[in-house]
């Protein structure tokens, strides 16, 4: 039977902290300023063990929690994790210990195994797009607004699949739409923040479609908020992927075979195959060289980022 004095929350940050806050609320500990002790970062094992040894004051339970216990992952001290694991049997019955970590825990570590055996472990994988969309709909209801599933999907596409981002964007959109109003797709397109990945996708699409003016306008907007190095890196990744697909197509490989070789799904491979059709393998190789030169020029300050990126992108896309 699980020990309800031991909790481990791991994975996606929003859900981890939500679970911790729900635990704190459910315990309803008296005099929390004395009986609840929280560590934002991981203390050493001795300090944590000492905190756990304390007795509650005028309360049934005492809560000790760590919001970023890195010893549960490959980043933190395995020795500290082992030391705490060996002490769990000696925790007072009045102490509730909750450990949180962002990302997947290292299940090989003794501490994880002990929590899995003795306590309650909850793991939260990164959300999928449909889960983020459903979350957006619920957040809109909390704000007194209405948001359809379809429009929520548009929001996730533009802003990214991240609970914190979606929560903030829905709050902003609810204010923009007005009390009790429905958040429309047009509201989302006008107000929602775009992820860098989405902006790169839009830039790439405009350049593939030979819309030089539209691409230049969007590039100027993106460079107002993003570092140019990040854009260059994502364009380099796009052209590396096109180069790989083009090379395999030239060898006679089919879409399914390419997807298996590159460990990608078939649909992205089909898109890449369509996009690289107008380029030769040699052109794509030369584009990667030009992007490397652009990266150096921007990082070294040799050239103005807007001018250098515009010239390079128009050249490598053949405009």
Task: Give the predicted meaning of each segment.
Residues 1-319:
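Conserved beta/loop motifs at nucleotide-recognition and modification sites
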């Amino acid at each position: 039977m699980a020990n309800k004095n031991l909790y481990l929350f791991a994975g996606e940050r929003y859900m981890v902290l939500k679970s911790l806050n729900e635990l704190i609320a459910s315990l309803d500990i008296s005099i929390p300023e004395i009986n609840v002790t929280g560590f934002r970062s991981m203390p050493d094992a001795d300090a944590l063990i000492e905190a756990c040894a304390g007795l509650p004051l005028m309360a049934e339970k005492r809560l000790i929690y760590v919001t970023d216990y890195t010893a549960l992952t490959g980043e933190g001290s395995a020795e500290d994790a082992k030391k705490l694991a060996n002490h769990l049997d000696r925790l007072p019955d009045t102490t509730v210990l909750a450990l949180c970590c962002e990302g997947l825990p290292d299940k090989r570590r003794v501490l994880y195994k002990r929590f899995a055996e003795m306590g309650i472990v909850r793991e939260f994988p990164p959300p999928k797009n449909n889960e983020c969309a459903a979350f957006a709909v619920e957040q809109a209801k909390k704000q007194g607004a209405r948001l359809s599933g379809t429009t929520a999907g548009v929001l996730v596409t533009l802003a990214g699949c991240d609970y914190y981002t979606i929560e903030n964007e829905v709050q902003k959109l609810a204010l923009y739409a007005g009390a009790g109003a429905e958040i429309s797709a047009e509201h989302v397109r006008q107000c929602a923040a775009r992820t860098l990945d989405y902006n790169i996708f839009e830039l790439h699409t405009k350049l593939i479609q030979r819309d030089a003016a539209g691409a230049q306008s969007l590039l100027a907007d993106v460079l107002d908020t993003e570092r140019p190095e990040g854009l260059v890196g994502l364009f380099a990744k796009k052209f590396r992927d096109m180069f790989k697909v083009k090379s395999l197509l030239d060898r006679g490989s089919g879409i399914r075979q390419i997807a298996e070789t590159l460990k990608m799904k078939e649909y992205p491979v089909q898109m890449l195959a369509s996009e690289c059709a107008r380029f030769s393998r040699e052109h794509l190789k030369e584009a990667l060289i030009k992007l490397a030169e652009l990266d150096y020029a921007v990082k070294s300050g040799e050239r103005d980022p807007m001018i250098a990126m515009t010239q390079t992108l128009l050249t490598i896309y053949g405009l």
